[in-house]
């Protein structure tokens, strides 16, 4: 006689690890309802509510509310690595809203759906960081991607923004298809969606051709989301076409979430195949370093320069992944966390120097900035020096960490490529510093920015790159704790 299987009842305690995500998604739905009753004149309340929701989620993560564990049969995993990534993701998402408020309001671009989309995109990134199955990876990825497409297209009257959103959507859909196809091959070969189950199935199997093919397709999808060459075609157009606050958001937190996706898929799921995919990741790293730096040199538009420099930074991040092991992943996370802070500050400077009717997005717009605004020039100097990897700024220690991980992972050739490209990359960052301090101003001096909140946030953000560079060890220890015991 057949018996019907029964499922254990799901209790409130079982959902405890999911508390930050539940609060965030609940806040997003509440904001969606609130926006219906708030006039355009009073949109500041939707802005403040969205920032408050992210602040509450940040506190929940920082205090460890809900505890660690896995739920839904391992589909959702909350561990130290997930908490580190989520904390930074939520912090940077909140900063993007703070940076963007005045900019979007002055240009009549601020609509209630923008903070709603940011909250849902943040929820998608948090799901990626905690994914324990292929299904959760795809759910988090699509939630992030669909919100990102809409955010890029938020300036409907701008042809560049519309074109960028269309390219982003088409190429993003293609990348999602590649990723999904790779997942289907892996599922067909292992018979499970669980990443831990896939790991065990691979260890007990001698037939790996189908698994390697699936891994290649998944790596292509991950590379697109990261912006690694040669899957970076969407980056320059999106960074240039999107409003600066949207470009800030897309350039920062999603990179950390994509790193989390790479870790879950490749190390947790496809770990037994690491000797094969480490070489592929190393190749992507080298190509990204070379292409990103060479293309960035030729740019006169600062947003496009930052887009190509992102490609090179992703190359350094992948260097840590290619190194593998506890040290490699800790170095890669250290780089990802630090880069999100640096990228936020770089686009924050563009926002702070822009005015309604004028976008400070060309390098020539920074000419003579020291003569007009020495404080702002000093902040931009800190940002560019950190991105270039000049000591004692934070960017120097991040590059040193991933280079060390590559050497320890027997990838000396990749470390040498990284050193050469780091020297090349310093050129275009130093060019921005040069025009600020040694070139004559172009045009009339810009009016002073009276937004004290924006100025304060940018000041703290930029000076943090110096402060954290002088005291980088706690961040590195934080990242090492996330991967303690990883072989």
Curated annotation (Swiss-Prot):
Keywords: Cell inner membrane, Cell membrane, Membrane, NAD, Quinone, Translocase, Transmembrane, Transmembrane helix, Transport, Ubiquinone
EC nos: 7.1.1.-
Location(s) in or outside the cell: Cell inner membrane
GO cellular component: a single term: plasma membrane
Residues spanning the membrane: 18-38, 44-64, 84-104, 116-136, 169-189, 211-231, 242-262, 277-297, 305-325, 333-353, 377-397, 410-430, 457-477
Disulfide bonds: none
Catalytic activity, as annotated: a quinone + NADH + 5 H(+)(in) = a quinol + NAD(+) + 4 H(+)(out)
Annotated GO biological process: ATP synthesis coupled electron transport
MF annotations from Gene Ontology: NADH dehydrogenase (ubiquinone) activity; NADH:ubiquinone reductase (non-electrogenic) activity; quinone binding
Key word rRNA processing present: no
Keyword NAD: yes
Pfam families linked: Proton_antipo_M
Membrane topology of this protein: Multi-pass membrane protein
Superkingdom: Bacteria
Main location: membrane
NCBIfam families with a match to the protein in the record: NDH_I_N, PRK05777.1-5
PANTHER family, sorted: NADH DEHYDROGENASE (PTHR22773)
Family: Belongs to the complex I subunit 2 family.
Function in brief: NDH-1 shuttles electrons from NADH, via FMN and iron-sulfur (Fe-S) centers, to quinones in the respiratory chain. The immediate electron acceptor for the enzyme in this species is believed to be ubiquinone. Couples the redox reaction to proton translocation (for every two electrons transferred, four hydrogen ions are translocated across the cytoplasmic membrane), and thus conserves the redox energy in a proton gradient.
Name this polypeptide is given: NADH-quinone oxidoreductase subunit N
Origin species: Xanthomonas euvesicatoria pv. vesicatoria (strain 85-10) (Xanthomonas campestris pv. vesicatoria)
